[in-house]
Amino acid sequence: MGIEKKQLITNGFFSKKRERIEEVVTMLKKSGVNSLLLSVDAFHQETIPLEPVKYFAECVVKSKIPVKLSPAWLVSEEDNNPYNLKTKEVLGKFKDLHIPIGSGNIVFPSGNALKYLSEYFEDGVAYSSPYEEDIFDVRAISFSPNGDVLNGNINNNDIQDILESYRP
C-alpha cells in the first residue's frame, strides 16, 4: 500500500509490568511503527499512573522509534489555567529523556470539555474544532479500539478493501 508514515498516538499505558512494556515496544518496532506521539498531560495523568508511561517512553527512546510528547492544552498552550500548569509539571518529568515536545492538541469546548470545563472558555465566543477534516480528502486514518475505521471494521474486512470501497 506504500504507507510511509506509520504513526501511533498512545497514552503509553499498556501494563504496569516492565517486561510487558518492553515486549510492547519490541512489537511496535517490529510492526513498522516509525513515528510515535505519546499523550502526556494533566488529563491523561488523572487516571493513568506516570511511572509505567515514563518507562514506556524510556523503552521507546532506546528502541530508536522517533517519539514526541503530545500534550493536550486547555484553551491554548499559553493559557495559565490549573490544567496547563499540571501539564507543564508532567512534561518536566520526561525532561531527562530528551524527548521533543510536539504541538499537541488544544481542548476546545465540545462534548465533555464543554460540560466539565466550561468555566475556562469565554461566553459568547463561537469556537470551531481545529480537527475537522474534509471527508473527501482523507490523508490519515484512525482505528477505534473495536476495529472501526472509515466505513468498515478491520475485524470483518481487509483494510485494503475498506480503503478501496470508501465513499463519503
Q: Where do the protein language model's features map onto the residues?
A:
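Phenylalanine-focused residue identity feature
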Residues: 13-14, 43, 56, 94, ...
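Radical SAM/AdoMet-radical enzyme domain recognition
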Residues: 1-91
